[in-house]
Amino acid sequence: MNDIENLDQPPAIFIMGPTASGKTALSIALRQRLPVELVSVDSALIYRGMDIGTAKPSAEEQALAPHRLIDIRDPAESYSAADFRKDALKEMADITAAGRIPLLVGGTMLYFKALLDGLSPLPSADPQVRQRIEQQAAELGWEALHQQLAEIDPVAAARIHPNDPQRLSRALEVFFISGKTLTELTKISGETLPYQVHQFAIAPVSRELLHQRIELRFHQMLDAGFETEARALFDRGDLHTDMPAIRCVGYRQMWSYLSGEIDYDEMVYRGICATRQLAKRQMTWLRGWGSVQWLDSDKPGEALDSVIQVVSA
């Protein structure tokens, strides 16, 4: 996952980082100083009506620095890494054609990887195969299907939890359609990104400080009306916790509260813990990322200058 060295290719900037690390603020500041246009790389910000719980850039922030690929799906709709790559490449081409630089900002590391390294040649979803798998699950339980996957593809089974029906179903579906395991197919990469990419990761030096920010921001979301926002989605009646939108951090815990499974205090506790776990996963991705320049989110001025210096060189 190295920077693309071909200087004949147009430039692009990646601003990556864990949740609550200051990515949005840095990107908006860069928009004031460089000829950049922002493209969101966030699997939660794509959904309309999910603003507070996703920490979506405010109307004022988007007026200062419009973000592309925000509010492009209803929460009932699906959106894959392949969908993102196709949409992002189009936005990047449009930005480059206008003589500006695409700045991709977010924390969905799978999307960044798909964009940078291309996608493995996985088969498209097959509703009939998926239905057959779900019928098996209803009869035998997901634990039995997980054991089946362990025989077919032990590497994937070790990565996928038995209580993760979406990923479990997909791993089985890939094998039933293609005759090849998910592990085999994901080793084959697709097209790389035709840009000279400057990659940055922003995070606090202290993990404790990041945890404090996460807790503070979750309480700020609640004060801003997160429960009301989630209840509006809950009351629609067509959304449930098997959908990617409702599995987003914060919304899943709010759903448990609204359905009476847990009380308010437990929802807050679980929401903060889940957000911390998300940040930990994001940091794990980034530490193994390769060619990336780290920025200290506690020194925003220095971070801004560092990006400008590298991009302008």
From Swiss-Prot:
Biological-process GO terms, alphabetical: tRNA modification
One GO MF term on file is: tRNA dimethylallyltransferase activity
InterPro entries referenced in this protein's UniProt entry, alphabetically: Dimethylallyltransferase, IPT, P-loop_NTPase
The reply on keyword tRNA processing is: yes
Query: Can you tell me which residues bind substrate?
Result: T19, A20, S21, G22, K23, T24
Quaternary structure (record): Monomer.
Explain the purpose of this protein. Catalyzes the transfer of a dimethylallyl group onto the adenine at position 37 in tRNAs that read codons beginning with uridine, leading to the formation of N6-(dimethylallyl)adenosine (i(6)A).
Family to which this protein belongs: Belongs to the IPP transferase family.
This protein's name = tRNA dimethylallyltransferase
Species per Swiss-Prot/TrEMBL record: Yersinia enterocolitica serotype O:8 / biotype 1B (strain NCTC 13174 / 8081)
